[in-house]
Amino acid sequence: MSLLARAISFAYVPEKYVLTEVTVEVERGEILFLLGANGSGKTTLLECLCGVRVPQHGTVLLDGRELFKLSARERAKYVAYVPQFPEAAFAYTVEEMVLFGRAPHVGPFGRPGRNDWERAYRALALVGLDGLSRRPITTLSGGEKRLALIARGIAQEAPYLLLDEPDAHLDPANQHRVLSVIANLAKEGLGVVATTHNPNSALLYGKRVLLLRAGKTLAEGAPKDALSAELLKEAYGIPFQIVGDGVGPRAILPKVEG
């Protein structure tokens, strides 16, 4: 059981591809991190995996079925997507925002039931926002809004969870909380794909990494292999140093000259 992008290419402008023949697969029960410089195609790849974007070439398979042959509601039952910068048009409460994650499981004219509310509150508790459930979403800090959106994705209870920079705009404690929650969800059987600009998030929490450069796959594999100093320099254009403990890499830092 997996979510597979097979040789996909995508262009916003005809023939100017931001993704070129990228193949990547995430299985249920693992975390895959997407890394690369700004403009390397991370978010576009994530959007192709969830059906927001349709690649001009290649295909996306959801547990062996073609993703784009499913209705939007059916896709949402299997793939939850947490974008980076959605803005709430209305001052919904935090609990109402998270409850939207239950929409694929409620009929078009139905109302959320007790089961849906329980799952929304469970998701809020997981990210530590249960004490803010009645607050308008517009009154939260940037980091708290990120946590609320991640809770909405968790409440959706899809077998695949896709997150665009879940560790962005968070203090170290909340970064650890969110990444630990994601890691535990993977242990429970979810397939997780997350973009990040922090190689250490992938090193500490990821099972596999896809490193992109200019819309093409530069490296794929275990973090300790795909995040070498040489490959990171090729991806980002600056030198890196790998700090180890004699057993394996423990931290990745930009190398400061002088």
Regions found by a protein language model. Name each.
Residues 50:
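Helix-to-loop junction immediately C-terminal to a conserved catalytic motif
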Residues 1-5, 9-21, 69-71, 89:
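A short, flexible loop at the N-terminus of ABC-type nucleotide-binding domains that lies
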Residues 58-66, 75:
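Conserved ABC transporter NBD signature motif
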Residues 235-258:
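ABC ATPase nucleotide-binding domains
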Residues 161-165:
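Catalytic Walker B motif of ABC-type/P-loop ATPase nucleotide-binding domains
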Residues 136-140, 144:
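Conserved ABC ATPase signature
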Residues 35-37:
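The feature captures the beta-strand-to-loop junction immediately N-terminal to the Walker
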